Amino acid sequence: MTRLPILLLLISLVYATPFPQTSKKIGDDATLSCNRNNTNDYVVMSAWYKEPNSIILLAAKSDVLYFDNYTKDKISYDSPYDDLVTTITIKSLTARDAGTYVCAFFMTSTTNDTDKVDYEEYSTELIVNTDSESTIDIILSGSTHSPETSSKKPDYIDNSNCSSVFEIATPEPITDNVEDHTDTVTYTSDSINTVSASSGESTTDETPEPITDKEDHTVTDTVSYTTVSTSSGIVTTKSTTDDADLYDTYNDNDTVPPTTVGGSTTSISNYKTKDFVEIFGITALIILSAVAIFCITYYIYNKRSRKYKTENKV
């Protein structure tokens, strides 16, 4: 008996046709419905489940049984018994509600062949539209604002009192690659501090340098070079103040940037399609057996009643 529902399920999967799609936004309610083609047979039970292996509910007459932590507060069953259309309403959609929903009808013939159970299955895809980026993404990427930058040219430097000659090396462009995020740092001028050991005079030129980031945000980096002329030689030191530290959270390899999940769902249920079909078949068999027992009991009772009436007349 269990092979028949499995065979019917395989046949329905082979001849499956592309199913319709329903698109909703997060927080909305989605109503899914499907019609059965066989309008002559009697519906024993209807069911809804979500692919790949999450059963939602089973409905027999006026009784509705929910599975896999689904409740009527989340998904309401809005179909009268033995209707041509079965309908459910999913309330307050979230990204996890997206996926393929399947409705199934289990029907029996209205003739005397009560052992035959027909099975119909229809699919509907629910798409839940999510926002393109979250608030955290906007703050870290700086895509919603473009800070103003200012550039100050160095004043004239008078090194006439210096007793020695020194050279200042211009730093090469620095490229910081973190996964797909690239920051290109370009220096146009440096802040130079020159100290003469013989004269004791010093001149200072400070210029904030713009750092161009490919993600529409700009920060400044100030580099200072100090050159001291002594009798033993020339000593050059470097100090850096990097405003890009404000974006350490974004560039940190240990930090995972926030992501928005849309259109994908994962089910952790242990149910399989084969189990659903077996449950449907067993339940249908139990219901049919109960109907048969009722009919036999009614027939025997009716027969005795007629016999009793006949004896009384005589």
Swiss-Prot record:
Sorted alphabetically, the keyword list is: Disulfide bond, Early protein, Glycoprotein, Hemagglutinin, Host membrane, Immunoglobulin domain, Late protein, Membrane, Signal, Transmembrane, Transmembrane helix, Viral envelope protein, Virion
Task: Give the organism's phylogenetic lineage.
Answer: Viruses, Varidnaviria, Bamfordvirae, Nucleocytoviricota, Pokkesviricetes
> Know the name of this protein?
Protein OPG185
Which proteins does it associate with, and in what oligomeric form?
Heterodimerizes with OPG040. The heterodimer OPG185-OPG040 interacts with components of the entry fusion complex OPG143 and OPG094. Heterodimer with C3/VPC protein; disulfide-linked.
Chief location bin: virion
Membrane-protein topology: Single-pass type I membrane protein
Q: Which ranges sit in the Virion surface compartment?
A: 17-278
For side Intravirion, which residue ranges?
303-314
